[in-house]
Amino acid sequence: MSQNKACDLCRLKKIKCSRGQPRCQTCTLFQADCHYSNRARRKRLVQRSKETFGGITLPVFDYAAGINGNEPEPSDHSIPNQENFALTTNGTISKNIEKPEDGEESVQRRLKLLEEKIDLLLDIATETSEFKRENKAIELPSLVTQIKDAESIVIKHRQGSPVDNTPTRILNVESLFPPQLPDWEKAFHDIPKKEVAHELVTSYFQHVNWWWPTFVYNDFMYEFERLYAFGFHSNNAWLISFYSILALSSIRKRLGNSKTLAESLFSTAWVFVQKSDFFLTPSIDKVQALIVMTQYAAYLSSSSLCRTLCGQACLMAQQLNLHRKQSTDVEPEKAESWKRIFWMCYILDKNISLIFGTPSVFNDKDIDCNLPDSKYELLFGVQSGGDLIFVPTVSLTIIQSEIRNRLYSVKSPTQMAAREKIIIPIHQKLKAWEENLPSEIKMYHEMLLNNTFSPTISLSDRFEFLTFAGMEVYFSYLNTLIILHRPSSSTENRRICINAAREAVQLLKNRLNIDLRVNVKADPLWIFLYCPFTPFLIIFNNLVHETDTETDSETLLNDLDLLHVIYDFFMEMEPVSDVALELVKIADKLLRVAKEVCSAKNNDVTDSTFKDIVEGFELNDLNSWDFDRVTNVMRNL
């Protein structure tokens, strides 16, 4: 005779049996023997089951001990003696009691058992929530996510503060990233004068294209001469690149009318993009045009334009198979140009997805493209040295993408121990990347960090080009360290984060104090304001949230000084970017909270001492800088 598919206890309780061995889940829960009876007539089986399992109930106290991690004491769940027990009407086994139990006592006893079960369920729920809180998934540290984290810290601080004068509402996403589209009415109807256009194009190749190589210099200038020779150009994609380059160069000059001029030039490029045939077929010229437009939108920190333009550029690059190895039949110069165009799309895609917390277009497992070859770097700029920045940036972006995929994705481990196993090898990759940086970049970094520059080096053109570029590389590296160690709660990882944040802000402070002219040549990606704001929040969190923060007045005042440096930087970027204006408001609220916390930790930290030690920096009026020659040229536009 065959056995039943469910054990006897599951059949009695009318529960689906898992048929596990040696005991199913139900029998394990009730700590009963798991027995499978042969198929028999239903009445006899039900009667025997009631007699056998009727008195089995959930062992509350033993189960609670199992939840707490202790071994439960063995319990006797054998069948009771039929002489001393009798079968009740509801199928349970009870002792033969001569006197029936009083009704009130029965209700109290049941209420007590109910309270015990509720307490047990609450204990289980509490332990489960604490376990999830300790091993929860880490959200991608986008700009909005970091500000929300800071907002939660402020709310927690305000709840324990007797005086509450600062509103806890810090972030308004709509005001931080408002939807912005170019205005068609501002577009140019005529081609700009050649002298003006040549000045702006040369500036772009000197300060942008040489270390973000998108165009071959000779090829672009050939098309430039054709435009002014014939008075028109038949390639709309090239015209989009042309007007976008003029707009980006104009806004980077930061003259009195540069913002209005840049908006008009970019609106002209936007008119050509809106033509119906632009997105129908992919081409190299269109990818280049979208890259420059993305750079302009990145300089203004326009989130909607950045995501749209960069996404279309990356999709076109994939359709053209730029992420694959090029055939040997392609000319080496052309293959190198296509390779660099792809890596430009890759860098933009990964940075924008990180800053705004959006999905990345490229899948790293699908990429089969070699790194740029430095022997071709002179094709893309008017001077050498660009690959000292571009090639390490590509390698660093690949590591950043690995960090995101392994620590911040849906499949990332939630246990802290598993995260540590991922963090250690990636940290070693980052240290190896830093050791393999070009010696010239390391030299500029050491001089910048220690605020020691020789007059000979400071007056050279190479210093002007490479110092800020090297600062951008190290700023990205320090932010990558923060992103890597941020998911871990260990003391060592927190120490790495706070040291990286302090070094990043110190770099910014020293650079802007040394030579204000280089500030004009700030990289568009860096002006996203994401890189400066990340160390700002790390230092703020260390001051306010952490309980083991150093409480000596010197350390607290130095950290407040660093926060004030970032605040001053946002103030100076306010005329360029609308996002900077919102970050100024956010930084001001956080800075006030940090001052209150530091004063509570150490009585020596007061407003007067803070004002004495904070040096800050105040940039000169940008309109008073020595750009008379360029100003006269732009006035003719």
UniProtKB/Swiss-Prot annotation:
Disulfides per UniProt: none
Compartments where located: Nucleus
Transmembrane regions listed in the UniProt entry: none
BP terms from Gene Ontology: DNA-templated transcription; positive regulation of transcription by RNA polymerase II
GO molecular function: DNA-binding transcription factor activity, RNA polymerase II-specific; RNA polymerase II cis-regulatory region sequence-specific DNA binding; sequence-specific DNA binding; zinc ion binding
Keyword Glycosyltransferase attached: no
DNA-binding region: 7-34
Entry's Gene Ontology cellular component terms: nucleus
Zinc finger regions, C2H2-type: 304-327
UniProt keyword Zinc-finger, yes or no: yes
Primary location group: nucleus
Protein name, entry field: Uncharacterized transcriptional regulatory protein C11D3.07c
Native source organism of the sequence: Schizosaccharomyces pombe (strain 972 / ATCC 24843)
